[in-house]
Amino acid sequence: MSTDAELQTISGLSVASKSAPSTQTEGVTASGKVESTTNAEEATSDVEEEENPLVVAARDGNTAEVKRLCESGSYSVLDTAEDGVTALHWAAVNNRISTCQYLVEQGAVVDAKGGQLNGTPLHWACRRGLVYIVHYLIQNGADPLRSDVQGYNALHLATHSSNVMLLVYLLHQGLPVDCQDPNGRTALHWAAYQGDALSVDVLLRWGSDVKITDTQGFLPLHWGIVNGSRNSLARLIEEGSDMYAKSSDGKTPHVMAAEMNTTAQLEGALDDCGRFPDGSQKTKYFDARTTNLLCFFTPFILILLGLVLCTFCGPIFGIILTVATLFGSIKLLKTLVLPSLYNGHAALLKSPFQAGIFTGSAFWVTVKYLTSVLPATFASHPILNFFFASIFGLAMYCFFRCMSMDPGYIPKLSGITEQKEVIETLIERGEFDTRHFCFVTYVRKPLRSKFCRQSKRVVARFDHFCPWVWNAIGVRNHRMFVLYVLFLQIGIPLWLALNSAYFGELLEIKRWDPLEFYLVIWISLQLIWITFLSFVQIFQICRSLTTSEAVNLQKYGYMGADDYSSVPLDHSAATASAKSVMNAHGHAAKSPCFSSVLKLLGVDQFVATAGEAIKHRDNRSWKEKNPTDSGAGTNCFDFWFPNGKFDLLAVFEAGKGGGAIGGHAVDYYKLWDFPDVSPNQQQTNNRSTREDGEALLAESQV
């Protein structure tokens, strides 16, 4: 069945399958073997292909053999099969960059049309998502706006490939984002139909129109409903898709969803966009600032209310009433407050509610300490009070600094021209993939950086997003965050010791303070996640790992996840862009509710980290696989004193990207390659090498 025939069938809703259309691709593997496909692109017979030495050599990337055959005079780069297919077609579709370069240099026609689809080498490469081949052909005159017999240009075919990096590249070449095929479908229609949320997002941010209809009257939203990708549907709805638009046969998105059995996905997407299941918009009662303030200060009231209920109703009924009040308050927040700014099932976790839990707890600790504990214990335990007050004050200082500062955002580029220059540089280095380029912000990603979904920015040396401080943890505030956690780890036991003395004083005078007693229990519970977090952070610092890197290591191993790289094996810089654990990305499937609880308490990462510690305790190959690990001592010194000087006051300072790896000063905003931290190299590069970066670190202090 052809692509258009398949779409016609689906538009009539007479099929049950919701898989993406079989966009006709050349049936040749990278190894040179012909695949069994349903398309007829390769019109040349199998026998002829196998017997044509030039085709075989071009397909296999044997440039030396191609050169020998052409120079012998027996074959020419202009030779074509009966259907017009050339050696350049086969080299292009099999990602043979060196062979393509030789053929083009010898005069091969870059826009030669061939095959039953009458496609050019560029079309063949686009169907496979081969960025480097596409780049080379366009640089040498290939026309990306030329269409094949089905009316698809390079942008349509790139969308069919689902390689988001190729889509980004072509858009930066100036191709119209909403060019339509003969059936009126834009690249956005195709991306939505395929359920390709990444491509949908890229096209929408580039300005693709969600209101364009095809010849059947289908919006991209209609085609998205056929596939049922919740993320794709949410983005289309966010950008203004008409929830009540009818197709030519009179079907609205809701009717189509019911017939295609994707109603749950559509309603989930509507919820993610702050809409009711019928598509109407939820009322927004507050502005962004008021919404955040309400979410932040609500825990202050809930904590006090819980303490009062336990005090006057007893522990059992008090806890029951407190839990009921908590759920009621959260329901109220989700109904009246959160829709003004946050939507979806994780709306509460996106808000500053958890930061409010910590701050509210600290606030009531301060109130009770100043009004009850301090007056009763200062005379008998002055030193203990001094240490607690100092540690608690430092913890709160680090908390607010960590919460309010820039964690290390990579600066945005000024415009498309600068973005295009970055893309060209990465292609030249063989690094145009999601490890080195952010397709959301269009910035080059330094090593160890990552895109933060909450802030929508790339963060240098990204560790994680912490809901307890409501900020990303990156190169600038990571030390402050670890200090905050460690001060809490020390301060809470000191506070418990003070309360032990306080209750001893009360017993002597036959009095009791139930409010303080329940506050002690509440704060003691906070010590659980703080202990887990302290262990994880200290362990990872000793291993020179960030939390993001550790999580990706546990999910995908050292090779990481798919990075949408299509770098040819014979690219001049292919070996320089070997995979590493540092910038992998992806998602793991877990039970949403249980997983959220584990993440909030830090249990999941604690268990995983403990497992890694046991697994690698005697594994010396770890250092060889982790390019930043120079041993626990050096790793810790690099983290706490990146300027190479043992300066305790400098620990509290935040830089602007300066750091150290294995004794080498680095700028995490421009870390394109890891320094050599191998044992032999370290012997020849002593601590004095840090002096080279002291100027950078000194300038970056704030």
From Swiss-Prot:
So which stretches are on the Cytoplasmic side? Answer: 1-299, 342-354, 401-479, 540-702
- A Pfam family cross-referenced in the UniProt record is Ank
UniProt KW keywords: Acyltransferase, ANK repeat, Endosome, Golgi apparatus, Lipoprotein, Membrane, Palmitate, Repeat, Transferase, Transmembrane, Transmembrane helix
Write out the biased-composition intervals (Polar residues).
Answer: 1-40
Per the record, ranges on the Lumenal side are 376-379, 501-518
* Subcellular locations according to the entry: Early endosome membrane; Golgi apparatus membrane
Recorded catalytic reaction(s): these are:
L-cysteinyl-[protein] + hexadecanoyl-CoA = S-hexadecanoyl-L-cysteinyl-[protein] + CoA
Answer yes or no on keyword Ribonucleoprotein.
no
Which Gene Ontology terms of cellular component type are present? early endosome membrane; Golgi membrane
**What the protein does?**
Palmitoyltransferase specific for casein kinase 1.
The written remark on domains in the entry is: The DHHC domain is required for palmitoyltransferase activity.
Designated name of the protein? Palmitoyltransferase AKR1
Organism encoding this protein: Yarrowia lipolytica (strain CLIB 122 / E 150) (Yeast)
